[in-house]
């Protein structure tokens, strides 16, 4: 059962009463918050989990809307001494507690380093109702060991609905912002491929973070090996096509042969003309490899 000291219990209870009125404005400023277009009716705080050592708290906020289903967000926050920092939230003082200023913990370097150590060391933290635990997999040791020294974390800015942290191009930690009871599909696929399949053309699952209460487990985040890349396949395709069209527009059409007039469906089974293949470069080989890997992934998932 979760246990906390009496002063800490009082502080957590105070946060539970104050956060519902302080959170709406904070949430509307966050890029990962999915309810910006909806009217917030009320916020409940079902649990708060103190993350020891770094003066941080994992806050679970259930957001009720005027219309439609409620959503639950997992919000790690760290207490700071002064306002004015990015993603900060202020709770005014009362007779029992001084002013409380919190900021998004994923913007805090010390917290991010602590989170990685927590996964490596199987840390767990009790909350008001449940507990959070961090679990490494066998793959973590081959990717990074704490004895090798600290690695520098950096928060990625590209994602909208979740938040990802890169650790020295060795590891990537994805924290789920909107959470639901049960195993997150991304994590479920990673666990299945690692434990039940020989398919290895995905980032290795190095660990995960979950919340446990009387209703079971809720996925909070997953740690994976970092894969060097040049962006996603869609952007890669757009760049390749732009370069192809530019090359074609500047080329001499003489000797290119007659342009096929059939539909794309009819042409899909025909070989690509040599001139077109030369102009588009290595893209077709990359697209073919992507198709093979996608098919292999689906076969691996279907083997369950």
Segments predicted by a language model, with ranges:
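Short Lys/Arg-enriched alpha/beta "domain-start" segment
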Residues: 2-40
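Charged, amphipathic alpha-helical segments
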Residues: 37-49
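Conserved ATP-binding subdomain of kinase catalytic cores across diverse folds
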Residues: 46-304
